[in-house]
Amino acid sequence: MKLIFALLLLVPVIANAAEDKVAVYLNFEQAYLSNDVSLFAPLLSKNYTIRQTLHIPGIGSDTVPVTKAQLLEGMKQNPKPSSLPRSKAESVKIETISKQQFCASSQTLDQVVVAGKNYEEKELRKACFNHKNNRYEAISHTIDVYYREL
């Protein structure tokens, strides 16, 4: 009986930890899509990297790795917020890597027009975080963009 009671007390703690990680990811994504360096830079680890891959039907894939410095400079040059759709909390999946690290992934769908044709644009986003100095820092970030003609 004591074991059941202990488990009932532990389940909300585990659920709250997962919700907190979802909030960490959503805050990170919002700062990234804001293109505001003052919001985004403090969330990044020293060696943060981002890699974006475009998957174009009938053509192939192209991956662009970008350093932290390159990304922040690009944000400074174009500080206008992105119009890309934001992730919803219910679409964020958390993967615990260790006591100090986790990764969060999400998916968004949008419709875009390219060369006069309508496409579905699906983004698979993943960011990994490390807990350091009482906060989470993003250590890596990948975005896979898939297009499908409608």
Tell me what each language-model feature is.
Residues M1-I4:
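Positively charged n-region of N-terminal signal peptides that target proteins for export
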Residues L8-P42:
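Short, low-complexity N-terminal intrinsically disordered segments enriched in polar/charged residues
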Residues V22-V24, Q100-S105:
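Short, hydrophobic/aromatic-rich segments at coil-to-beta transitions
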Residues P42, K46-K93:
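A solvent-exposed, acidic/Ser-Thr-rich amphipathic alpha-helical stretch
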Residues T49-R51, S106-V112:
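Generic short beta-strand segments
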Residues L71, A89-E95, T108-D110, K122-H131:
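Hydrophobic/aromatic beta-strand elements that line small-molecule binding cavities or substrate pockets
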Residues P81, D110-E120:
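Short, cysteine-centered beta-strand-loop-beta hairpins and adjacent loop/turn segments enriched
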Residues Q101, N118-L150:
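Short beta-strand edge/turn micro-motifs at domain boundaries
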